[in-house]
Swiss-Prot record:
Protein name: Protein PRRC1-B
Pfam families hit by this protein: NTPase_I-T (PF01931)
GO molecular function (one): protein kinase A regulatory subunit binding
Species this protein is from: Xenopus laevis (African clawed frog)
Keyword Transferase belongs to the record: no
């Protein structure tokens, strides 16, 4: 049907190749793209596939009239008879003069140039611009300007370079390298003599393993002393901030003591004293009866009252017959003519070990007038008159003096409380008791 409509169906054929002597007129409106002949080269003979042809109207840029006709009769000049293995595609309407001595028309298809004749004089040799930074072992297989397209700067990665890797030297790490011998500080410090006990401890630890080391540390007297001081310091800090914590920290152990009173002034003083001496002790209070006058008079009455408190608890079954007990009893005594003093008696009774100890607090002076008032207030027919008075000295002082308590009037006369007096005497008693006990019990 295409033949009937008058349209030719013959495909366009490739225009015949133009010869080298053909000239292009200045008034031509389009540049014909000739296919240059492929010449055989003794060095390299690349094979090219047929190039596609373009229509005559594919280029519309007119050639200026000032351009003279191109002549290709001048022999081409090459820098070196190297085989052309790369294909260059320069832009259109640009004269290539990097490797030729005469201007050539711009090609739209990659040209293939024949090798130069043997009698051709070599032209000036163009060398590649120096690289920055220089790289050892760099070689170029072409004279192509690699700085083209990079504003005159050498690209970071050249297009077709081949590198020969330089030997890599591994630098030593400055952090781990050993210091240079012979270089030292001008400042010297005196060396302390080594303690032989430390070496002995380390030798025992290494010989017996970890348990031997622990045993050696635990058996070192210096370590024991440091640990004891540290423990004591911590307990002191805790008990200073909160005195009530002392009974919880030091309560425990095998030592169990009962105080024959429920008054805190007596129980707390005995507890602190025994825990101070033994480290840990269980101290509790039970209400024991003295069965003597409220205000004992004389040492014998004081001792009788303290012992009666212990016996009353054992008779009633409040404590075991073999239970160690501590009893405190205060009394007055005329140590000098018309000189009366208040004294506290502290006794320790341990039937299991057969230990009985007595101690006394410091003597607190009592004015004679207050003692006489207590004697006058006691009836003559008082049945316990043999042991003392029915009215205590503390009651008389509380009635006579303002801001004075019957239970702790000692601080008003001496500046030292009754509790501190009992604590001091009981601490001495606990020290004697510790010396009497067998080492296996401790």
């Amino acid at each position: 049907m295409m033949e009937e409509s008058g349209i030719e169906t013959t495909p366009p054929s490739t225009p015949p190749p133009s010869t080298i002597g053909t000239s292009v007129a200045a008034s031509t409106s389009a540049i014909f793209t000739p296919v240059p002949p492929v010449l055989s080269s003794p060095l390299a003979a690349p094979a090219f596939s047929p190039l596609p042809s373009f229509a005559q109207s594919s280029f519309s840029t007119p050639v200026p009239s000032s351009v003279p006709p191109l002549r290709t009769s001048v022999p081409l000049t090459y820098a070196s008879p190297l085989p052309v293995t790369s294909v260059y595609s320069p832009p259109a309407n640009t004269s290539v003069s990097a490797a030729f001595s005469s201007p050539l028309p711009a090609f739209s298809s990659p040209p293939s140039f024949p090798p130069p004749p043997l009698n051709t004089t070599p032209g000036p040799v163009l060398t590649a611009p120096p690289m920055n930074p220089p790289v050892g072992g760099f070689s170029m297989s072409s004279t192509y300007d690699i700085t083209k397209g990079h504003a005159g700067r050498a690209p970071q990665t050249p297009l077709m370079p081949t590198y020969s890797a330089a030997p890599v030297t591994v630098l030593p790490n400055p952090v781990v390298q050993a210091p240079i011998a012979g270089i030292g500080s001008s400042i010297t410090f005196p060396e302390e003599p080594e303690d032989p006990r430390v070496h002995t401890m380390h030798d025992e630890g290494s010989a017996g393993g970890i348990w031997g080391f622990i045993k050696g540390v635990a058996g070192n007297p210096m370590v024991k002393s440091v640990l004891d001081k540290t423990k004591h310091s911590m307990e002191t800090v805790i008990t200073t901030l909160d005195p009530g914590m002392a009974s919880y920290i030091r309560t425990g152990g095998e030592l169990d003591i009962v105080v024959t009173s429920i008054k805190e002034v007596k129980v707390s003083a005995v507890r602190d004293a025994f825990q101070e001496v033994f480290g840990m002790a269980v101290v509790s209070g039970e209400d024991g009866q003295s069965n003597i006058a409220p205000q004992p008079v004389g040492y014998a009455a004081g001792l009788k009252g303290a012992q009666e408190r212990i016996d009353s608890l054992r008779r009633t079954g409040m404590i075991h017959e073999k239970q160690p007990a501590v009893s405190v009893e205060n009394f007055i005594a005329e140590l000098l003519p018309d000189k009366w003093f208040d004294i506290g008696c502290v006794i320790m009774d341990d039937p299991v070990h057969g230990i009985r100890l007595e101690a006394f607090t410091q003597a607190t002076p009592v004015p004679l007038e207050y003692v006489q008032q207590a004697q006058n207030l006691t009836p003559q027919d008082y049945n316990l008159r043999w042991s003392g008075l029915s009215v205590t000295v503390g009651e008389v002082l509380e009635r006579s003096l303002a801001h004075v308590s019957r239970t702790d009037w000692h601080v008003a006369f001496t500046g030292m409380s009754r509790r501190q007096m009992i604590y001091s005497a009981t601490k001495a008693l606990a020290g004697m008791y510790k010396q009497r006990l067998s080492p296996r019990i401790l």
